[in-house]
């Protein structure tokens, strides 16, 4: 009796819940599917959440990189402004130094007062130059000097100022008029000027190439002496190269004897003195130096034409 009653109760319960013995297995399978679907949905949701979190982190990193880039660009802009300001200050200083140097150089018109068919070609590479020229009357004679100081730009320009001072002292104050003696006096004076630094352990190895011409128009003669810088004499479609001594001014503490050359002037003679600035220019399709051979050919080609 009790067993029968219990079986009826269980049957009623299954019937109430909609589960009968025939579809019990189906209900379990449906539950499994629901669980799987739920798990999939949960995984998708978690994946989406992780994706969103990763995306947010990446966006944060990108924003930080952009801020860092903006800060770097701002720093670069400020540094560029500072560099431009410094460059302008340096350039302004060099331009002012150029005016000082040019004020010390004689004008081309001054030379043309003596030699109408003459010219000066002076084109500094770095605003100021280590090359210089010097022209001065001495009685009825004329000194013409061309020089190339060691160093470039500012250092060469400072050396050129020293060089002009030494020339003026030798000729105008000490009245040394023989070109070779002027070079010897300059060599000693320049070496003494820089030897003062030797006492503190610093040896300055600076000097200059230089050529000096003393032109005596009354006697129709030129007296030339040089240290490395040559004198070119063009006459009757030929070029005569008169070389200076290979002894740099200021680099030899001993009393050096330089060589004098005496030249008789003839009508239509053309004389050139120059530094190595022109021949050291690079150019052409192979970007090679101009060199002395091309310069000699150029001078032979143009010397028949009027200078002006």
What name fits each language-model region?
Residues 1-31:
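Hydrophobic transmembrane alpha-helices
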């Amino acid at each position: 009796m009790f067993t029968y009653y219990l079986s009826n109760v269980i049957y009623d319960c299954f019937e109430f819940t909609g589960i009968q013995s025939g579809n019990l297995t189906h209900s379990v399978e449906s539950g499994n599917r629901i669980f799987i679907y739920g798990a999939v949905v949960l995984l998708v949701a978690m994946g989406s959440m992780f994706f969103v979190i990763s995306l947010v982190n990446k966006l944060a990193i990108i924003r930080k990189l952009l801020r860092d880039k903006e800060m770097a660009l701002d720093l670069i802009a400020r540094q560029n402004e500072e560099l431009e300001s410094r460059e302008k200050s340096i350039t302004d200083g060099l331009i002012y130094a150029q005016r000082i140097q040019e004020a010390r150089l004689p004008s081309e018109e001054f030379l043309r007062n003596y030699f109408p068919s003459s010219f000066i070609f002076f084109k500094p590479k770095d605003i100021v130059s280590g090359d210089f020229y010097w022209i001065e009357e001495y009685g009825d004679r004329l000194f013409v000097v061309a020089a190339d100081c060691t160093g470039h730009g500012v250092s060469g320009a400072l050396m050129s100022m020293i060089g002009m001072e030494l020339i003026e002292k030798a000729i105008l104050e000490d009245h040394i008029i023989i070109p070779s003696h002027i070079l010897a006096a300059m060599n000693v004076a320049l070496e003494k000027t820089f030897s003062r630094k030797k006492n503190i352990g610093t040896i300055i190895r600076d000097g200059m190439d230089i050529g000096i011409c003393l032109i005596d128009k009354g006697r129709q003669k030129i007296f030339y002496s040089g240290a490395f810088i040559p004198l070119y004499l063009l006459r009757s479609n030929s070029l005569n190269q008169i070389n200076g001594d290979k002894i740099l001014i200021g680099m030899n503490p001993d009393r050096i004897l330089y060589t004098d050359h005496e030249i008789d002037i003839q009508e239509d003679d053309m004389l050139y003195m120059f530094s190595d600035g022109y021949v050291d220019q690079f150019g052409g399709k192979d970007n090679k130096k101009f060199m002395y051979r091309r310069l000699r050919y150029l001078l032979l080609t143009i010397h028949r034409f009027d200078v002006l």
